[in-house]
Amino acid sequence: MDAEVVGLDPARGRVETTRGPVNYDYLVVALGAELAPDAVPGLAETAHTFYTWEGSVRLRDALRTFPVTGGRIAVVVTAVPYKCPGAPHEAAMLIADYFRRRGWAGKVEVHLYTPEPQPMPVAGPVLGDAVMEMLRARDVVFHPLHRIAAVDGRARAIRFEGLPPARFDLLAAIPPHRSSRVVREAGLAGETGWVPVSPKTLTTQHERVYAIGDVTAIPLPGRWKPGVSLMLPKAGVFAHAQGEIVARRIAAQVTGVAALSEFGGDGYCMLEAGEAMAGFAFGDFFAEPGPRVELRRLGRAWHWGKVLFEQWWLAPPGPRREALRVALSLGARWLGIPMVT
């Protein structure tokens, strides 16, 4: 059915759509995260974003026409959580690489601001330090613990809470994220604003209702600091794995066999750094006493692995998709890394 979901009624087992109501026996909520640029005064009117297709095209064009005299480019994480923990760092490094390849090194400054204490904090201090070194090596200035308050488009300045403003000539922002209106109005969102689920089974508080992907809030058992809880990041690799687990569990319930499949919290990502180079981070996010995540050194293999993964993901079912899956699986086995295909 090609329709938009306009309401959820877990108590009655019904989904309201633009083409009428649909009753269900099992429901999988995979409505993702919405962008809310209007939550930051001045952001929507001033900032570019690469978190939408249209925004990415506009940002590309703005970079192509950036003044030859140079200037300052700011990449800003406006709030947490956000989709893909490595995306802001990749964006900053790729922007710096773009101008370096144009011979503009020294004319363009790239600054990355975030309210987080380090890059990818859920992965721990060792990985965070490694990513900061990657940023430094690519002339990206990293500004942690900068919580945005507003953007002054006329003055071309970012206002932060309790810190001096930062000037920019071009601003690329990761807007605040929130769950969809449908999820909130259905009472599925918890205190965090996202749908709380059982970490391993992805079940919600409602019978026969599951949630997967960016819409979920999944607490992690480990800690990096006493009393400071961690949440599973929002990333496609987790949504992919969770979807397969939920499908198996529902199939088991329908056929009357034991539902044994569980989500294990394993995840990975390729971290693009420019120059056709990337790092590879992977590990067990459910590990204790803290998530056990490893970052492999920069290499071309990780970059081309990401290109191959994208082609596999976008390919329609058929021989080409299967060939790409086999190539990915063999490459992952050769490199000694996990890969969800």
For each feature predicted by the language model, list its residue ranges.
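Flavin (FAD/FMN) cofactor-binding core of flavoprotein oxidoreductases
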Residues: 154, 261-281
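C-terminal auxiliary extensions adjacent to catalytic cores
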Residues: 279-341
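A Rossmann-like FAD-binding core segment of flavoenzymes
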Residues: 3-15, 96-197, 257-258
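FAD-binding core/adjacent interface of flavoenzyme oxidoreductases
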Residues: 1-103, 172
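Cofactor-binding loop segments of dinucleotide-utilizing enzymes, especially the Rossmann-like FAD-
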Residues: 78, 115-117, 214
